[in-house]
Structure formats: structure tokens, C-alpha cells
Amino acid sequence: SHCATNKRAPGRIWYISRQAKMTTCLPPASRERDGVRANNNDTLMNLHEYQAKALLAEFGIPVPPGKPAFSVNEAMEVADELGGGAWVVKAQIHAGGRGKAGGVKKVIGHSAIEKAADSLLGTRLVTHQTGPGGQPVDRLLIEQPCVVMHEYYLACLVDRALERVVFIASRAGGMDIEEIAARHPDKIIKVVADPIAGLQAYQCREVGFALGLKDKQVTALSRLMLNIFHLFSARDLSLVEINPLAVTSGSDLIALDAKIQVDDNALFRQKALEELHDSSQDDPKEHKAREFGLSYVALDGNIGCMVNGAGLAMATMDLIKLHGGAP
């Protein structure tokens, strides 16, 4: 079942085989090439986690109580407002891998939250998705912690090969999707939404049972997936990724982390989303080029490429690398 070419019926649930190539089934920002992100960012607009969770909450998808903070004092005020004696402090950048890079800290007490906020704000966080220069941290998300019993992976995205909106799910939550695909390809579940009828409740239930959820949790997952599909369609999104989707000690489902990408081509009718764009996360050269309507991707090599298509660009870079160059 090669996910790049398989044209199975939209209503069927199927598993990715161990031999399948996962590239076209992965969320766009997850695909990398020689350490450089290969997604075409000039057609995608990333949101910060706190912005993504606000959208999820708007569409009835459970998220932990939390608020953004732009200074150390504001972080402490948010902690007081949330209450409790423990919090999670999350650096807000447009890249994954924050936890492994020290960008997510669990703290107890006001002195600890002050120290954590001070250590993150004003720095540049380097993860496996940012490149060596990292990305600036000028805002934080302060949340109440949750007691997690199990973590799952759930994403809604456009599969270009199938030309359909698809959902990808896995029991191996909390891991990068590339890692899941490499280590547990048989644990990745995929359902395809019909372009006319949309995602169906029975498909959501099938995913829930495949994940091993209990009856009430299956019902909750169905409601959550249908709400995600509604959000995805109503806001012209390219990706909604929840990793992890957690089962709490009360057997509730909650989105512990969220990533949302918006299709730039739809921003003319999504003005509210356009205003959420944080240009500080853009590469300065890419941002300048975008002002002139140019698609420019900054790389670390010494050979520039001027090409007239994404496919030709990737092939050209492959040839340059093959002959010892650095695009």
C-alpha cells in the first residue's frame, strides 16, 4: 500500500505498510532534506502553538488552560491567573523539537516560573528543524499541567498524491512523525475524507477502535476529528497536527500540543488569520523577497539556484550535491 500512489476508496481505513515510502504522507513541515526543511514555506503560514490552540478551542477541541506571555512579569501574572502551584512554560517558535532543545519546561513555584521565563525570552532556540541559527523566542505559552495516561498522534492534512484531505493517527504519540514512520510504520493509520461528503462519523469511530480507545473515548475522538475537519475546511488550512493527543487521568481527550499551517493562497479571505503572522520567525531574506512576490528559500551553501519550479529546484540541488557542491 504505497501511500504516494494508492487510490483506495475514500471511505476505507488502511494502514501504511512497512515497505511504504512515507514522504508524501507526512505533514509538510516534517519533511527535511540534508538537514534543511523541504516544505515550500512561501505557500504556508505557520501559527504559534497558543494561536493554534485558540483556534482549536474555538471549534470545540479541548486544550489545556493557558495564555501567552511576552515578558517575565506577564508570565508570572498568567501563572497567578491560572492558579495552582505548577505550570508548563513553552517557548513559542515556528519549529518542532522544542522539548528536546530545552524550550519546554515544567516548573513548580513562582521563583521557578520566573527563572524559566527569563532563561527563554530573548534567546534563539535551536532545534533539529530550525537550522544552526535557531529562531527568536519573544513569547511564551504558560499552561496548567495535565496528568497523562496515554499519548496519541493525530493530524489532518492534504495528501497531494491522493488529492484529498486525510487524517493520520498513531498510538505512538509524543514522537516526531518521521520517527513513528521509521520505527512503527505498521502503527500509522490513515483515513481519506470524501471531497463531497466530507469526513464521516463512522471513519472517526474506526480510527478510535484502531487506536484501542474505549467506547466513550471513541465517541469523544469522533467529535474531535469532525470538529478538526470543520476547522480545516472553514479556515483554509494545510495542516492541523496534534502531537500528542492525550488521554488524561479522567479519561478525557485533550490536545497537549498543536501545530497549524494556513494556505497563503487563501489569506485574502482569512484576514483574521493573516493578522496572526509573526514575521520575526521568517528568514529576513525570505521575508524581503516575499515583498517583491518572489519565492526564495535561504540555504547554507555557496551556490545559488534560480529555477522556475519546485521540482526542478530539488533536482538541481540534488545534482549540485552529487557533484560535491553546496546549494
Regions found by a protein language model. Name each.
Residues P27-A29:
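Extended, low-polarity transmembrane helix blocks
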Residues L44-E241, A246-P327:
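ATP-dependent carboxylate/acyl-activation modules
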Residues N6-K7:
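Alpha-helix boundary/capping motif
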Residues E32-R33:
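Glycine-biased, low-complexity coil/linker segments
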